[in-house]
Regions:
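Short, surface-exposed beta-strand/loop "edge" segments at domain boundaries and coil↔beta transitions
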Residues: 10-14, 50-54, 77-82
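A short, sequence-level motif marking secondary-structure junctions
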Residues: 17-24, 58-61
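A glycine-biased structural micro-motif
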Residues: 29-30
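Acidic, low-complexity, intrinsically disordered interaction modules
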Residues: 37-41, 45-74
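Short, compact, well-ordered microdomains
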Residues: 67-95
Length: 110
């Protein structure tokens, strides 16, 4: 499935992975992951970011996300992750564009 990976001080990029927890954990760099549901996507991140003193990556709805995080599609029927559509990729690539985030946004809303 195609996902977006957003790393600290980097532009978002598309990555193709298997639809399994191990693939997500490997990217996040942590065995424990947190999943937040937002409309048509899921935000996957490291819940220990504050405890591990990871740098703030982006702000989402006022929440400081620390460390690398992932955006996946949301398969509501199956209650599972799914790949992002081309439209979703475009939308979230623009939303988390580093230059946009740095220049004039402190908080992105999903």
């Amino acid at each position: 499935m195609n996902i977006l990976v957003i790393e600290n001080n980097e532009q978002p990029y598309i990555k193709r992975i298997w639809n399994d927890l191990d693939s997500l954990r490997k990217i996040i760099g942590e065995q424990d992951i947190e999943v937040e549901e937002y409309d048509d996507v899921l935000l996957v991140y490291n819940p220990k970011g504050i405890k591990d003193n990871l740098p703030i990556n982006r702000y989402i709805n006022g929440l400081a996300i620390r460390g690398t995080f992932i955006i996946t599609g949301n398969n509501v029927k199956e209650m599972d992750f799914m790949g992002l559509s081309n439209e979703q990729i475009d939308k979230y690539m623009e939303m988390f564009d580093l230059e946009r985030e740095t220049n004039y946004k402190k908080s992105s809303k999903i």
